[in-house]
């Protein structure tokens, strides 16, 4: 019996985080990618189990080998589940991480060797507990501790969500979308800043500026000075995270694989999702005659493997499994780069918002929860009832990208906004469900909740100053901003403010409405709200006034 336990325990222990990974990235384990990844892990687990079984109780050397194989199993589990190796490497370098990992393995081998008589029972109990915790719902922890933790903060970025006053009610679904969003936020006690706008048109600049409560003009082109040197999508300084830490809150980050908010100097609990199901996407393309219908099935399966690896991208072991699985599928990653769609985050949004909700309800007070969702970001893959549309067309920058002008531009804008507002109605439904679940829990009655867009819909002629008309400024920069906090009155605020300034006002308090100016081409300070606008010459930028607006007039 003990040998059977030793044979199967490594397999069960290593498969548990893989099962969790499949649940996390919304991929069917029965897909080609699923079979390839599971086969790799199963081979490793069974090989370790066979070695442990064969060597068990075959003298001191045999027991050392058994202890060694089980120690390797536990190390691989730790890396698959928590990214132990890369986390160490981030702090002490690759060589230091390798040395520490080796030392840890030696210590673990010695401990297991000393406890060899009890090892089979220990491994069996650990394997059963892991499998149970992976497959079964743990339930929700709702009992308050003796000392009440600090009120929670819930912070959601809805990528490409235009502001309330930026919604043109004359366009298809516009009036319905505006009413639905307003109704949801009013129902749940929010204050809506109807004329909020972002100072920046690009997410990688807008969101870190908001998280640093920075409403200045000190930004170098398409980059953020809060990013690591030479990086565009990894951010070192996010002062809101630091502020939440000082307030006694644990910071939890829920993000896509496109922008990384986890590498910040503040310690965070990181959840990175990659939710693209390549096989289903390719099947739809073939059925409907889409532009990617001729992509080989192996490339679609590779997309699933890539999603699994990115969803566990802190794991060295998962990266190795992904490499082997990709080779089993006989394809190359370069094939993926030619067609990888930007639609998978949008398709998985309802699922991921539900996962974010579960994490909030599970962890409770004493936590700050940050999430960045690419929704209602293009393309519009859902209708107003959150049913898939099987539509994959990008809608941004109709002149600069699609070459449209005149009547063609106007007609395309009306059409694209119809799809966009339909997806916005889906967003309103999902947010309503989310708020119903979270706010019905008494632990979150005094939570601070912020929901904002990072820029406008970008259904415009383009982003460059030379291309933009007055309405394009609204399309590109108007951004949703809603806040629910004790002491903040419910209702609608029609003052013109940037989301970056609103964050500074909300979290820092007593901030000047005059933006600090550091850019050399701008002298002094400006009392007028303004936006950071690219121009055709990539070496120069423009600071343009953001005039009062109401898109329905």
From Swiss-Prot:
Residue ranges of the TM segments: 4-24, 34-54, 65-85, 99-119, 122-142, 149-169
Top-rank lineage group of the source organism: Bacteria
Keyword Magnesium in record: no
Membrane topology of the entry: Multi-pass membrane protein
Location within or outside the cell: Cell membrane
Cross-referenced Gene3D superfamilies: Alkaline Phosphatase, subunit A
Keywords annotated in UniProt: Cell membrane, Membrane, Nodulation, Plasmid, Transmembrane, Transmembrane helix
A Pfam family per the record: Sulfatase
Principal cellular location given in the protein's record: membrane
Gene Ontology cellular component list: plasma membrane
Function: Not known; does not seem to participate in nod factor synthesis but required for nodulation on some specific Medicago species such as M.littoralis.
Protein's recorded name: Nodulation protein NoeB
Gene name tied to this protein: noeB
């Amino acid at each position: 019996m003990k040998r059977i336990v030793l044979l199967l325990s490594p397999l069960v222990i290593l498969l548990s985080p893989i099962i969790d990974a499949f649940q996390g990235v919304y991929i069917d384990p029965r897909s080609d990618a699923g079979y390839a990844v599971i086969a790799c892990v199963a081979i490793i687990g069974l090989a370790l189990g066979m070695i442990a079984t064969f060597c068990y109780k075959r003298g001191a050397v045999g027991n050392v080998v058994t202890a060694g194989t089980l120690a390797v199993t536990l190390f691989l589990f730790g890396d698959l589940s928590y990214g132990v190796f890369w986390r160490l490497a981030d702090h002490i370098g690759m060589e230091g991480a390798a040395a520490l990992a080796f030392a840890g393995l030696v210590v673990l081998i010695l401990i297991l060797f000393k406890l060899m008589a009890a090892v089979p029972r220990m491994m069996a109990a650990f394997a059963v507990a892991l499998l149970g915790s992976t497959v079964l719902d743990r339930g929700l922890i709702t009992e308050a501790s003796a000392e009440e933790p600090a009120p929670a903060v819930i912070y959601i970025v809805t990528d490409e969500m235009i502001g309330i006053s930026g919604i043109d009610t004359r366009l298809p679904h516009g009036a319905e979308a505006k009413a639905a969003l307003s109704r949801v936020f009013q129902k749940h006690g929010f204050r809506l800043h109807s004329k909020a706008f972002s100072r920046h048109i690009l997410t990688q600049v807008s969101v870190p500026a908001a998280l640093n409560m920075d409403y200045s003009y000190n930004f170098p082109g398409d980059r953020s000075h809060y990013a690591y040197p030479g990086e565009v999508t990894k951010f070192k300084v996010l002062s809101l995270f630091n502020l939440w830490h000082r307030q006694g809150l644990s910071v939890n980050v829920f993000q896509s694989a496109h922008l990384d908010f986890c590498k910040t100097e503040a310690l965070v609990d990181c959840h990175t999702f990659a939710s693209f199901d390549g096989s289903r996407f390719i099947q739809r393309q073939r059925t409907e005659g889409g532009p990617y219908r001729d992509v080989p099935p192996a490339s679609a399966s590779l997309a699933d493997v890539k999603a699994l690896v990115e969803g566990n991208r802190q794991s060295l072991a998962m990266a190795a499994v992904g490499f082997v699985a990709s080779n089993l599928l006989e394809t190359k990653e370069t094939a993926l780069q030619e067609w990888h769609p930007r639609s998978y985050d949008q398709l998985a949004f309802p699922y991921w918002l539900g996962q974010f909700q579960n994490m909030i309800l599970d962890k409770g007070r004493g936590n700050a929860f940050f999430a960045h969702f690419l929704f209602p970001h293009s393309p519009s893959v859902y209708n107003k009832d959150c049913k898939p549309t099987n539509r994959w067309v990008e809608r941004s920058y109709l002149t600069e990208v699609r070459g449209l002008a005149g009547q063609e531009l106007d007609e395309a804008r009306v059409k694209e906004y119809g799809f966009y507002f339909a997806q916005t109605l889906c967003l309103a439904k999902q947010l309503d469900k989310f708020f119903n679940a979270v706010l019905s829990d008494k632990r979150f009655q005094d939570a601070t909740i912020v929901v904002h867009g990072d820029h406008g819909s970008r259904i415009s002629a383009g982003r460059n100053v030379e291309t933009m008309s007055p309405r394009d400024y609204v399309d590109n920069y108007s951004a949703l901003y809603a806040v629910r906090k004790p002491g903040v009155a419910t209702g609608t605020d029609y003052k013109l403010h940037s989301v970056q300034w609103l964050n500074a006002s909300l979290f820092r308090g007593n901030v000047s409405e005059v933006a600090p100016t550091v850019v050399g081409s701008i002298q002094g300070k400006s009392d007028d709200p303004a936006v950071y606008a690219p121009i055709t010459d990539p070496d120069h930028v423009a600071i343009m006034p953001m005039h009062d607006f109401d898109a329905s007039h």
